[in-house]
Amino acid sequence: MEPIPINAPDYVKNLKLLQWVKETVALCQPDSVCWCDGSTEEYDRLCEEMVNSGTFIKLSEQKRPNSYLCRSDPSDVARVEDRTFICSIRRQDAGPTNNWVAPKEMKATLNKLFTGCMKGRTMYVIPFSMGPLGSHIAHIGVEITDSPYVVTNMRIMTRMGRQVLELLDEEAEFVPCLHSVGAPLEPGQADVPWPCNDTKYIVHFPEEHAIVSYSSGYNGNTLLGKKCFALRIASSMARDEGWLAEHMLILGVESPAGEKDYVAAAFPSACGKTNFAMIIPPGEMEGWKITTVGDDIRLDQQGKDGRLHAINPEYGFFGVAPGTSDKSNPNAMATLHANCIFTNVALTPDGDVWWEDMTDTPPEYLIDWQGKPWVPGCDRPAAHPNSRFTAPASQCPVIDPAWENPRVLPISAFIFAGRRGDTIPLVYQSSNWYYGVYMAATMGSEKTAAAARSATCVDPFAMLPFCGYHMGDYFNHWLHVGRTVSDPPRIFIVNWFRKTRTGKFLWPGFGDNMRVLKWMMGRVHGRSGAVESPLGWMPRYESLDWRGLDGFTSNKFSKLMSVDREGKQELFSHEELLEKLYDRLPKEFTHIRELLLSTLWMSPEHWELAPELYSAES
């Protein structure tokens, strides 16, 4: 059978793209081809088609205008890390923390799976830009998919459509991203609301800068511009070209005097990343302003001024719904007022959405994420724990005025976070770039609130699932960046989750984290006092702004900042990962670890800020 025509619009000039689409049509055998233009009319048409097919449920126009609910197949609710592959030419370049298959072998497997995989479906061609259009840091990709769900989500999450193709001239490079739900339809066969396949592959070819995803419909596996391109492929590109692609939020911090800084922060799962990106300062800290640039990914390069400059490559927010509320993140809730797609949350009788912790008291009746009746106390969640929202970033009430600036934003500080009930203080500053890189490389979180130290999960730079090459080479690349940037960002480590012996959190968190952020900005500009500790530079009690938090005594602060000699156990917990990476581990890491261990051994058994220093100035 002859392949159908690709029907490329006149404004498509890129020869490589035209040839790739022709080859993909011949392989996948779709019934038709649609070149996505990114228009409102196209989005509305696809949403209406999915409502008619049962994939989407239109929410109340009064409660949630122009928004939709989608329920996935129960087997397709999250990223599939065990089916995610880095197919570098050499196995050792993927490293021991990634799954690897030889490229030739993987391509043979994928070729069989993709043969005829789009029969009975429409093939959509989605041109998109990861970053503001025209930015020298932005990168263009093209995703081919047979899922209208992917198209509508990509329109929210990326700058996509005709405007991107008009930037892609005849010889311009782009990253090809191929996706299929893996569920071809025979003539007359009825479709299902959420087509997918049990055989899943999420594959990256770093040398070719190419991505292939098969059989999943879940956003994290199908919105290929996000983790697949902007982190796994982009991190590999960044290593080769001398820049950084990181799993980090970006926020703006403006002082009452009008001094503006930009900060990037890496938070592992369940550490409050989106909440921090949209933090609201306490009312007593009048004049301080926080703006959001992005909540998940940043790309940056060195500027002529010797600093790192960054962009948010995304156009929307793809966030976890449960736990998001007017208490925890009012700015996020305001962002979700309209024009959103919700996946696997619960449906209220009046046509709105609900998820756990959204309100203090759950509704009396819901339809849960699997379409079943739900009432309080029925012993199952109303929303899936990994249920998601996709929302336009432009709707965020504190979006930074320069968030789409193609000239990029200078970064003053990096923050790396963990979730630890003990050992790690509230905040400290690394003494130098190399030490900061080591601390970021060994950052960890407890798997549960009651987990023992042995259950700590080490997640370097919050990049363990997303680094597209050997993690040891990744550490070396970070050290190299520090050697080439004349004015690098200052590096800080935070832990909002330190507890008392009875299990209560010592730090209030949420908006009060602004007090720590203010101290950091003072350190960046050489104004805030600090004390040298076994781990780095720490704030004195009087260095933080305590207005509105009068009950937080210096004694309580001392406990929050203390360092036990048991901290050496934290260093021992790093061994498993570092031994895995030993053949490419930076030599500096061995020396830094020994120096830290020696410092902890020689420190008092229980190190605390000395009270007599509280009033001293550095």
UniProtKB/Swiss-Prot annotation:
Compartment(s) where it occurs, according to its Swiss-Prot or TrEMBL record: Cytoplasm
UniProt xrefs under InterPro entries: PEP_carboxykin_GTP_CS (IPR018091), PEP_carboxykinase_C (IPR013035), PEP_carboxykinase_GTP (IPR008209), PEP_carboxykinase_GTP_C (IPR035077), PEP_carboxykinase_GTP_N (IPR035078), PEP_carboxykinase_N (IPR008210)
Entry EC number(s): 4.1.1.32
Biological pathway: Carbohydrate biosynthesis; gluconeogenesis
Binding-site positions, Mn(2+): K227, H247, D296
Gene Ontology molecular function: any one: GTP binding
Catalytic site positions: C271
Record keyword Transport present: no
Top EC group: lyase
Catalytic activity, reaction form: oxaloacetate + GTP = phosphoenolpyruvate + GDP + CO2
Keyword Secreted on entry: no
Binding site for substrate: R79, Y218, N219, G220, S269, N386, S387, R388
GO BP terms: cellular response to glucose stimulus; gluconeogenesis; glycerol biosynthetic process from pyruvate; oxaloacetate metabolic process; propionate catabolic process; response to lipid; response to starvation
Family as reported in the entry's similarity comment: Belongs to the phosphoenolpyruvate carboxykinase [GTP] family.
Complex formation: Monomer.
Role played: Catalyzes the conversion of oxaloacetate (OAA) to phosphoenolpyruvate (PEP), the rate-limiting step in the metabolic pathway that produces glucose from lactate and other precursors derived from the citric acid cycle.
Protein name listed in UniProt: Phosphoenolpyruvate carboxykinase [GTP]
Protein's organism: Chlorobium limicola
Organism lineage: Bacteria, Pseudomonadati, Chlorobiota, Chlorobiia, Chlorobiales
